[in-house]
Structure formats: structure tokens, C-alpha cells
Amino acid sequence: MLKRKSKKRWLLALSAIGLLAFSTAIIAASCKNEQKDIKEVIPPNNPNNESTNQTKPSDSTDKKDNTTTKPIEPGQTVDPNALVDTPPPAEIKPVMDALEVSVAQYNNANTPAAQLSINDLKNNLDQIKLTLKGNQLSLFTARVSELRPDYNDAQQNISSKTGHAVLVVQIIHNKSKTYITKEIEISGFKTSPVLVDENGFIIQEENAAQKQQQLDYFTKYNADQRAAFDNKEYMVGLKNQWNNALLKDVRPDLSTVSNNHKNHFDELSKSLGLDTYDNQAYKGYTLPIYNADQSVNGLSIAKKLPPQGPSWVDAYNRDRFKNKGLARLLLNQQYQTMGEQTFSVLFTNKNPNYKAGNENDSKIATDDKSKFPLSVHRGTMWILDYVQPEDNSYPTKWYFATNLHVADLLNETTEGVSLTRLNQKPPLNTPFSLTEYDDHFTQFIIGSSNDHDKTQRISEIFKVVYKATDFLNKDPVDYLADQYKDEYKDKKEFADFAVIEVDFSKVKNNEWSFVSNNKAVFNGLNNDQQKLIQTLTNDYANQKDKQIKFINYDYLSNFENHSAPLLKPDFEKYTGDQFYLLGYPLAIEDFYFSQYDTEKVQGLYRHSTSLWTNAKYEFFKQPSVDEVGVSEETKAKNQKEMQQGGRFSYQIGYRSFLNKPGISDAFLASPYNGNKFMKTHDNKEFISFGLQYMPRDYEPYGGASGSSMRNQRNEVIGLYHTKTQNTSTGLVLALRSSGFDYKGLYGSYNLPQYDLIYGTGKDQKTSYRQALEELYKNQNNVHTNLFPNGFSKEKVDSKFLFKNS
């Protein structure tokens, strides 16, 4: 499952979003001449009919066409690829030049111009019907090849305001396939008082000076200047989302904070690279309330969160509605490795809302939860660790990492678990189909066929051995203002991370099922336990060079070394970390299927998954490096770009560290998990804590929760846990944080220091290592791949120790 932030549309786009380039649609409108063939006129200087075009003599019937007006209907086949880009024959060109062309109707419904916008025409040029007037009309075909909108001095399309544009028409000589172009001015179309794009989104109108400012942003601005530019425009849009309400109405919990308090806060926050008090308040951040003596009484958590908008930088010169990642395609070996180690997990649970008999009651809605005895939930998890057998046989006890809100679905009601992963050595640059309907994926299903022991068997095989709940030395309530302590006294902190143990040795032969492309596979594999587990894990234990590692730093304290430059030439020289994410969302928002594919998979989206990565959407239709006809230069360019990973998003709403794009403090900027506090199946609520990252181009649908974020060395950075709708990014929990001292800005609260794998932070009390230490405290001979020397802190590699812990 995937927690979401607000779905509310960010209609008032930021000014820089308005700087997105608009591509002009060029759609051929082929026309068919319904009249009988009319022979070309043979010029007087060619009496022997020796035309260079081998034309026949004209007859008297030709005269009938000479002064008529002829409608050109869609349907006449003219292959645009067959046109000849040379001047028409000399004897024909004067006739073509004399032709007059006009618009007969703008679409198939013959809608008047006043009821259409220029944007309505842009994607439907093939519906425009033309009329030709002149001589020898049967010799020619006309079609609209281009629509040229009006532009302002910043090169923005402003036809939505002017209602005016120019149609570029090709008049084609049918015999020679040569053509001339003419232009038709069109006007009187529906107008808008503001600029809107073809999707109906409002965009900020700019001028040449603003364009220059954007150029300066990329080429001259430092991090602080970029943050100031982005934040100023973002706040305009954000306040519009609040209907320009006063701060006292947006955040009544902060009504006692004076201007003196704010001024003091702003002075210190600026020195720390943080936003002003008022801006943080509008963004829904956790903020201090003060005592009469100016000291901080404690913090106040916002009751209502605003919607978030995208970053214009992330979407610059791209389709911002597609900046969600790349579906069903592996571009490079790093994604391939992650695909071999990452699983789509599905839990089948008893439905607590089910009422026997409701499934047959026609009066109850078909999608009512009470009709279904079982419920299914999906997430993403990946191989974390395994217990090393003493006899050096292939491991049977494995540990998988995922989000807490995914692992929480594994509980006393779970009757079955399905693990789906890519088969070993999956192909690169080859589009897959839906995960459940593709031979490159295999589904391993575990569950008892006996109704009386289904949940018991699952609980014996699967266990959640670590949850990052109440993992810090202090509770959230310790930082809150006095007036909120009682309200939040029972809410502990959490990081969205958990570890699931799977003991495959406990699975009985008849509790296995194997499916690939909706067909049973691996007949008899359940009789060979070692081979089965080796197959399921893609031989992970024997591939030491592919096994995961963990970074021993964080990007807040090492931002300068890992801040990818914006300009392409600079990025090609960049040696810092690049980011790779891979998960399995439901295919509901997989927009990459073609019309033919859609027909094949129609009806399967809601119950199937698509492999998803944070690669650029543009690569889906890039020519393959092996494709015939592609130049060597293009092949080399594509190959180089496809090896690259992603970078941090410039989304500024969640970015609590203003001059460090992609870096955020969860407790301050997003204490909720979605729009509410995280609630586990036992009804306990938790407040989000820890360091968070925001990767660009990763906004998959539900099911991708638990996706790992790694660098180019296959070192794990964190786990993706929250989709932030329409922002081209999401929230990733950092598994390691060096902490950050706010110098008293938020009272006693500072970003905590922790390492959720190795447990070496000064502010934490639990970790995966400590969970294993407790689990095996009476078994000194147990070792795992990550902890080959034991589980005590003294055995941890020194590179994971903090200098000031």
C-alpha cells in the first residue's frame, strides 16, 4: 500500500512552471478528392505531350473545374513520408500559387470557432476540413501541417488569451508529390483572461526579463539564490491554495506568536538555511510557541496540511504530467540488479468488514467491503539479510526490508502471502508487460489449503522482527507545547521501516505454488527445498558482488559532494551519487501502454502491477542502442544517458532545508503519513520522525511503498514510503542520519542522529541490529550476512560509527 499526500490540483502554477516549453503538434490531415480524375494541362510549348511528368492531354471536361470551389474531406490518402521536398514542376507551380485555401470547418462536429479554444485545435488538426478554390482542383490535395500559436516576448504560447493563430497548409501536387505551403490566419476563438495550457492548467504569463532570470537561475545563481527564487513563487501559489487567507485563520494554533518572536526566529532560521516562520506556517510545518519571556514553550503540529505543488525545475522542457518515473523497462545494470533483489509482496487477509450473506445481497453495492471475505494488500520489499547456515548450505532464513505500513499488513488475519520478482538476468531496454502476465516474472505463493490453520501457518513462516516504532530516546510529546502534551501523550514516533523474517524451511511442499504469465511453472520444484529457495532469491547468497551495502553518511551533512548540477555538461562531469529506485505499483496509472496494449490488458490494471523505476519517462520511446538505422552518435548518447541514475527533486514544499534540494526533516515538514498519523492494525498512532529525501521522477501509484533508494554502488540509502500527488516526487526515509543542531530554534528538538540498520546513533534505542541481538541472545552461534561477527555494537564496522555519538 502507498500513503498519499493531498490529491488536490495545484491549478495556480508557479511562475517558473509557466516557463515550460510548448511543442507544436504537427498532425497530418489527409484529404481525398471525390471528383473524377481530370488530366493535367499540357503547356503550349509541349505540343507532343512530352511532359516531364508524363501527363495525358486534357479533354473538355477539365474546364468544368476551373472556377469551382472544392471541399477537401478527410480520408484522401496522402503519405506524408512520400512528399518530395523540391519545387513543384514549373508548368504546375503558377496554378498552385493561384489557388485559394480556406477553412470549411474546425472539427467533425462543425463546432463554431467561438466555442473552441486554440488548444482544442492543437491536438485535432486532422479534423480540420479545408476548401480549395481555383483551377485544376483535381490535381491537388490540401492539408493542415502545423498550427502556429501567438507568442509573447518570452516565447510563451498566448493564443489562449488572443483567440488567434496561424494554420500552415500544404497544397500537394498529387502526381509529383511536391508541395507549396500557405498560411491561413484564424481568429474569433474562445479566450481566457489568463494563460492556460492544453490540459487546462493555469500558467504564469512571463516576459523576456523573466526568461533571462530563468537562464540566470541555471547558469549564475548559487543555492541560496535559487531557493529564494523558488520559494517566493511557490508561496504565491500556496497562499492561493489557502484562498489568500490570513495566517491566523490558516494556523490558529500559532495565534499567540508575536512579530518579535517571528523576527527572532527568522534571524536564526536564515543562518541555518531554513525558511521564515510565516512561510513554514503556511507550508504546514511543526513550529514553536513561546513563553512570555521569549523562550520556547514547545512545538505545535499543524492540524491541516496544504496541498503541494511541483517544481518547475523538475519539469523544465518536459511533460510535467509524465514526470512520475519509467514503467516496465530496465535501462541499465543497476536497475537490473535491483530487479533481481526486489519483490512485489501481496498479503491475503481475512476481511474484518465481511458479513456472511452480503455477497448475495443485490441491494448492497458491488464494491461494498462487507461483500468480500478476504482483502488483498500490496507493497514492495527487498532482500536485506539472511542467516548463514553452519554447514554452508544455501540459506533458508531470510530478512526482507519494507515500510512499516506494509509490514503491518502481515498480522494475525493473514492467510496467504505472494512474492513476485523478476527472473535472473532480465533483459535491458525491453518493455515488459504487466508483472502477472509476463514470462520474465515469477510469483511464489505460500499458503495452506486447510481453512483451519491458514493464519497459523503464515504466522509460523513469516514474522515482523523489527519495527521502527518508538525507536528514539525521547517521545514526540517531550518537544510539544504544554497545551498539547495531553493530546499527544499516547503517540510515539516512528520511521516507516520494518523487517520481515521468512523461514522458508518451514514451508511444506504442498504449501507452495509457482506462477508465471498466469500459468503454473516449476513443476516439482517444491520437492527440492535448496533449489527452490535459491531460485526464489535469484541465487543472491552466492553473488557477493551484487549484494547490497549501506552508505555510511547522509546527504544533509554531505550535500555539497552529492548535489547534482542542473546543466547537462556539468552533470556529465559530476562524480557524486546518483539515485536508483525500483518498485511495483498497481498499474492503474501506467500511461505507457499503447492503444493496442491497452486492449490486451484492459480490465487487468486494478489487480496487476507494473515494474517502476525513477528513470526518465522519455526513455520509453528512445531508439534502442541496437536499433537498425540509428546513428552511432545517437547510440552513444543514448547509451551514456541510460546508464545514469536520478537526482534530488527541487520540490520546495517539503524541503525544510531551503538551500539543499531534496532534503527534509519529517517531524517538521511532514509529521503525518499521508493526511493523518500512521495507525497500525492494533489502533496505535505514530508521528513521523527522521531525515527524509525527495528523489526526482518517482511518483508511482500504490504498491510501490517499500521501494529501496540506492546509489550507483548498490548502497542502500533509504525506503520510499509516501506518494505526494502531482509533484513528480515522494518521500524517502533515510536509514541513516547524522542529526542536525537547530541551535534552539525549535526548543529542545533537533533532527535525531540514528542508523536504523547498525544502531550506532546517540539518539536511538532500537535498530535492526539490536532486534537481531535480542532475537538471538541465547544463540551465540547465529550470524547473518550483514553481521558475520555477531550482533553487539562492538562488532559493527567502524565506518558506521558516528564521530559524535
Question: What is each stretch, according to the model?
Answer:
Residues 3, 8, 31, 35-38, ...:
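Short, intrinsically disordered low-complexity segments
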Residues 1-46, 167-169:
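Gram-positive Sec-dependent secretion signals
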Residues 36-81:
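Ser/Thr/Gly/Pro-rich low-complexity, disordered linker/stalk segments of secreted
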